[in-house]
Amino acid sequence: STAGKVIKCKAAVVWEPKKPFSIVEIEVAPPKAHEVRIKILASGICRSDDHVLSGALKVNFPIILGHEAAGVVESVGEGVTSMKPGDKVIPIFLPQCGECNSCRHPRGNVCKKSELGPFTGLLYDGTSRFTYQGKPVYHFVRTGTFTEYTVAPEDSVVKIDASAPLEKVCLIGCGFSTGYGAAINSAKVQPGSTCAVFGLGGVGLSAVMGCKAAGASRIIGIDINKEKFPKAKELGATECVNPLDYKKPINEVLFDMTDGEGVEYSFEVIGRTDTMTAALASCHNNYGTSVIVGVPPSASQIAFDPLLLFTGRTWKGSVFGGWKSKDAVPRLVSDFMGKKFILDPLITHTMPFEKINEGFELLRSGKSIRTVLTF
């Protein structure tokens, strides 16, 4: 048994921004009290990981990225009661301690222990479990899943159905839940309503699925890459718009498409400040709601006309789709197993972990929706 011992394994380490991943042998320390060591079997490539590589998100280096994964518990630290070795699990970047105000509030889901910036790259005790040639390597959002083994706090790991296919349900660890929940929980999309989704990547398409599940009658997908349109329509978009096809701003285009009313719900699923304000300006001036789902670049600022809000619009953010992570993830996995929603159309590529750089190239070139790396 490897329990209680240091494990040597392969990991994809990033040494500095704008540089590719290097696959190297690292050492993974045993879990401390209330921590879990996980053998990762599948990990999705999410745009937030790429935001670190591009330098848009500021983190400490060297780092092991990856936060949308599934695996099996290898060993547990002292005091861990909610899972045991051999259990299938999903590590989550959003913990649920169950004790802070946010965890206890019916509408809260951003636990006090969350690391949503500044990013320390360390576990709760202020240290890392990863080392390379004796020097510490940082964890991304306390998950760090582009490695054969990782260690995460128990309150950030969720036990799931033993029969769940890990190479699919790993998407519930971030992308799917984030988009789907933004529509259902954060916006609370109503039946018969009109929605606009800015950005048709994996999270945007999941938002489209959430709008459809909530009963929206019109779902307008917006992207500058028209290759994304057929998949968006397959998943529920009723029409798709490329802003580059118009001389006027996209919010004016959307007002024209809705008889001068604007949409009832808009979702920014890109992470750009200009599209955040465009999404706000696209919704109904009195009862429209716009939700920021895309991760904004570190230290970015927004300037906008407050009259946009004064007339009654609601502008809000959404992290992990508003779900309480430990409560929701097992339910979402069960719903997937019960065919309440599908994940297959979101997964365009599956490739061995060693091809991680190729997977990120597919993302940047707009050729993939989700690439799942298998170990």
From Swiss-Prot:
<feature type="binding site">
    <location>
        <position position="223"/>
    </location>
    <ligand>
        <name>NAD(+)</name>
    </ligand>
</feature>
<comment type="similarity">
    <text>Belongs to the zinc-containing alcohol dehydrogenase family. Class-I subfamily.</text>
</comment>
<dbReference type="GO" id="GO:0005829">
    <property type="term" value="C:cytosol"/>
</dbReference>
<dbReference type="GO" id="GO:0008270">
    <property type="term" value="F:zinc ion binding"/>
</dbReference>
<feature type="binding site">
    <location>
        <begin position="199"/>
        <end position="204"/>
    </location>
    <ligand>
        <name>NAD(+)</name>
    </ligand>
</feature>
<dbReference type="InterPro" id="IPR013154">
    <property type="entry name" value="ADH-like_N"/>
</dbReference>
<feature type="binding site">
    <location>
        <position position="111"/>
    </location>
    <ligand>
        <name>Zn(2+) 2</name>
    </ligand>
</feature>
<feature type="modified residue" description="N-acetylserine">
    <location>
        <position position="1"/>
    </location>
</feature>
<dbReference type="GO" id="GO:0004745">
    <property type="term" value="F:all-trans-retinol dehydrogenase (NAD+) activity"/>
</dbReference>
<feature type="binding site">
    <location>
        <position position="103"/>
    </location>
    <ligand>
        <name>Zn(2+) 2</name>
    </ligand>
</feature>
<dbReference type="InterPro" id="IPR020843">
    <property type="entry name" value="PKS_ER"/>
</dbReference>
<feature type="binding site">
    <location>
        <begin position="293"/>
        <end position="295"/>
    </location>
    <ligand>
        <name>NAD(+)</name>
    </ligand>
</feature>
<dbReference type="Pfam" id="PF08240">
    <property type="entry name" value="ADH_N"/>
</dbReference>
<keyword id="KW-0560">Oxidoreductase</keyword>
<feature type="binding site">
    <location>
        <position position="228"/>
    </location>
    <ligand>
        <name>NAD(+)</name>
    </ligand>
</feature>
<dbReference type="InterPro" id="IPR002328">
    <property type="entry name" value="ADH_Zn_CS"/>
</dbReference>
<keyword id="KW-0862">Zinc</keyword>
<dbReference type="GO" id="GO:0042573">
    <property type="term" value="P:retinoic acid metabolic process"/>
</dbReference>
<feature type="binding site">
    <location>
        <position position="100"/>
    </location>
    <ligand>
        <name>Zn(2+) 2</name>
    </ligand>
</feature>
<keyword id="KW-0007">Acetylation</keyword>
<feature type="binding site">
    <location>
        <position position="46"/>
    </location>
    <ligand>
        <name>Zn(2+) 1</name>
    </ligand>
</feature>
<protein>
    <recommendedName>
        <fullName>Alcohol dehydrogenase 1B</fullName>
        <ecNumber>1.1.1.1</ecNumber>
    </recommendedName>
</protein>
<dbReference type="InterPro" id="IPR013149">
    <property type="entry name" value="ADH-like_C"/>
</dbReference>
<keyword id="KW-0520">NAD</keyword>
<keyword id="KW-0479">Metal-binding</keyword>
<feature type="binding site">
    <location>
        <position position="67"/>
    </location>
    <ligand>
        <name>Zn(2+) 1</name>
    </ligand>
</feature>
<feature type="binding site">
    <location>
        <position position="174"/>
    </location>
    <ligand>
        <name>Zn(2+) 1</name>
    </ligand>
</feature>
<dbReference type="InterPro" id="IPR036291">
    <property type="entry name" value="NAD(P)-bd_dom_sf"/>
</dbReference>
<dbReference type="GO" id="GO:0042572">
    <property type="term" value="P:retinol metabolic process"/>
</dbReference>
<feature type="binding site">
    <location>
        <position position="370"/>
    </location>
    <ligand>
        <name>NAD(+)</name>
    </ligand>
</feature>
<feature type="binding site">
    <location>
        <position position="97"/>
    </location>
    <ligand>
        <name>Zn(2+) 2</name>
    </ligand>
</feature>
<dbReference type="InterPro" id="IPR011032">
    <property type="entry name" value="GroES-like_sf"/>
</dbReference>
<keyword id="KW-0963">Cytoplasm</keyword>
<comment type="subunit">
    <text>Multimeric (with different ratios of monomers).</text>
</comment>
<dbReference type="Pfam" id="PF00107">
    <property type="entry name" value="ADH_zinc_N"/>
</dbReference>
